[in-house]
């Protein structure tokens, strides 16, 4: 888009009213760092509950946010920024975090960054520009650590934002191989008027297994006046006291935590770490309360469980496809059902039954096709997921049970017709003059057939609906 078009685009944003809340102060703060797929609303709220002073969102890319629509969600009491192309939530926030949430932005263009800033500034406490991410996606787009190689562009982006927005602007960088060059870079960025700068104490090419360099951060902190936020010490962080120790080693004004918080967000508690099951329960309740995407909730729980995913309970968890199923494992099934019904009554459509959201648009396209409509006309459908871990032996699998039942009753064996959409499958089970199917799309043909057989067994009265609801197979 040309510069003229960008200026025209920006003119559509009215000058926001002055914010009533105090300007965010970055000194003497314990902060949850930006983490991809982790820093969504439930985890941010839990971090604040545990004692964090400031929470950062996961990195959100400017182009994705620019095209989103801001929508108040009265059912959840949230503000949602929605992708109009598929209805997915790009960014969700609420009043519980407004004064303490910082949105981290992935950008390589000052005009785009400003457009995002004007769109979101009334719903956040601060805006941070990612200048440290070494991932290939960021580098190729000229974002993240790529900006470390272009200080002039980095400074221009920051100066544009500090000049035109009412909220404090920060950036997050990595150290350079040379300490003096790092100091020079930080001084150039500080001169743009930013409120603070987060520094990961490793270079662009170093990874978590490498030791951080707190001595470099100490040298930088003594050379500038703005707050320095130390990051990169998770290897040695196991308790709240460890956070303060790393901050002191770096001579920093504040400390920012990523991996240690991802493993157990109760590291922010001054009173001590909580057991992981208690943390997971607290997290899942927030996921239910704020209708968090199941795939995102599952990813965060996996990060907490680590090697416990290999236990029987962990393996059952890995089979889960919905938030309801995950909650059943931690004794929150009734809470999830009750809350989702309550939210539905208040007008929240919800995404509780959606997994693999990257395939959502393809599913919707397939489901709208006339061919599929014809295929599923007259088919008895239920929201039924096949969870392999709930069946101890092959003889108990739904297809086998239905096959044996047909033999005992002298009826023709059931047959299956399966449809495929890219890597997703849905099957119709034909048995005794009727056709049955699950409304879920499964990862493979076998699971799709088992789901269809489950629907048949339930509708024919050979399975108990309450049992299926309790084990998470059936979503009401």
Range-by-range predicted roles:
Residues 79-169, 174-182, 187-190:
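Active-site beta->alpha loop and helix N-cap motifs at the rims of alpha/beta catalytic domains
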Residues 59-74, 131-149, 199-208:
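Glycine-rich, proline-tolerant flexible connector loops at the mouths of alpha/beta enzymes
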Residues 453-467:
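Short arginine-rich
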Residues 409-445, 455:
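Positively charged, aromatic-enriched nucleic acid-contacting surfaces
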Residues 57, 126-134, 191-202, 254-262:
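Non-cysteine beta-strand/loop elements that form the S-adenosyl-L-methionine
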Residues 1-31, 36, 41-42, 49, ...:
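Alpha/beta catalytic cores of nucleotide-metabolism and tRNA/nucleoside-modifying enzymes
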Residues 35-37, 60-62, 106-108, 132-134, ...:
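Active-site beta-loop-alpha junctions enriched in small/polar residues
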Residues 6-24, 35-119:
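Glycine-rich, positively charged N-terminal anion/phosphate-binding segment
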